[in-house]
Amino acid sequence: MTVLIHVLGSDIPHHNRTVLRFFNDALAATSEHAREFMVAGKDDGLSDSCLALSVQFFPGKKSLAEAVIAKAKANRQQRFFFHGQFNPKLWLALLSGGIKPSQFFWHIWGADLYELSSGLRYKLFYPLRRLAQKRVGCVFATRGDLSFFAKTHPKVRGELLYFPTRMDPSLNTMANDRQREGKMTILVGNSGDRSNEHIAALRAVHQQFGDTVKVVVPMGYPPNNEAYIEEVRQAGLELFSEENLQVLSEKLEFDAYLTLLRQCDLGYFIFARQQGIGTLCLLIQAGIPCVLNRENPFWQDMTEQHLPVLFTTDDLNEDIVREAQRQLASVDKNTIAFFSPNYLQGWQRALAIAAGEVA
């Protein structure tokens, strides 16, 4: 049997590193189909830290796509597992037959599914991508994204799978004995990416709570984002006093980010699609409820796991937030499907499906 090849087709360092380390640490030892990778981007020490994997790096999307297409044409039995498919050339290859449906297995990350960009280039490309998506052999995604995808592609097979968020299961009970009182701290957004709609979110928080809460906005990622960070800071200062606004422009190490999250009382995410699952998981683990847009289908995954969900359209106040905290504290977090290590079973099944080992 031909060994499955995993493709990280776009240079997204943070997510690519998370996936590679997860496969190296949790999957490679038990499956030959978890070891071969083709990655767009620089090595940056990943080969040395992922010794259980065989990783081939490419300078960009185009060179990677050309190599994948060549392999697909040379051996039609070769199967590929595409993680977060942000590579237009690969979609076009699937559409044109360069890659066959039986070779193409896709794990949806969120942004690669939705059509939110307004630029002309995207408007022209989206219909082609939609046609290509009808030809995918199988998609893997959250419950909400599977539901969203099935509305336009009902004949494509879908399987539940969660992004392998870096989590320490021993911290699942860390919030149970914490007392929350006084001024609330609200986390706005999960990164500095514009898709978080930070300014709209800050206005929504202010409309609900006024200048009575402290707002923390993590914007250390992506890099070279100074102009937008300053734009968000100035908009925030028009709404909140300086002591109640904390815009973080430096990237935080994982432990520092965890510490920051534990200081919050609420997460506020206004974007209308699934994204930021990693941050949501870490907040839920810490006993911190989240506010989601009703258009964000991840609320389906949360309710399936009996987790409280607040919406941006709800009338929010401190009593409602504290009640959501109490409800969250009563949940056995060791049973949540999208937490580590529970998502591992889904990955083992996904590998078997993509490799053709199970029907």
Curated annotation (Swiss-Prot):
Known EC number: 2.4.1.325
- The protein here is known as TDP-N-acetylfucosamine:lipid II N-acetylfucosaminyltransferase
Q: Where in the cell is it found?
A: Cell inner membrane
Q: Any idea which GO molecular function terms this record carries?
A: 4-acetamido-4,6-dideoxy-D-galactose transferase activity; fucosyltransferase activity
Q: Could you tell me which species this protein originates from? A: Escherichia coli O6:H1 (strain CFT073 / ATCC 700928 / UPEC)
Q: Which family does it belong to?
A: Belongs to the glycosyltransferase 56 family.
Say what the protein does: Catalyzes the synthesis of Und-PP-GlcNAc-ManNAcA-Fuc4NAc (Lipid III), the third lipid-linked intermediate involved in ECA synthesis.
Q: Under the cellular component aspect of Gene Ontology, which terms does the record hold? A: plasma membrane
Main location as per UniProt: membrane
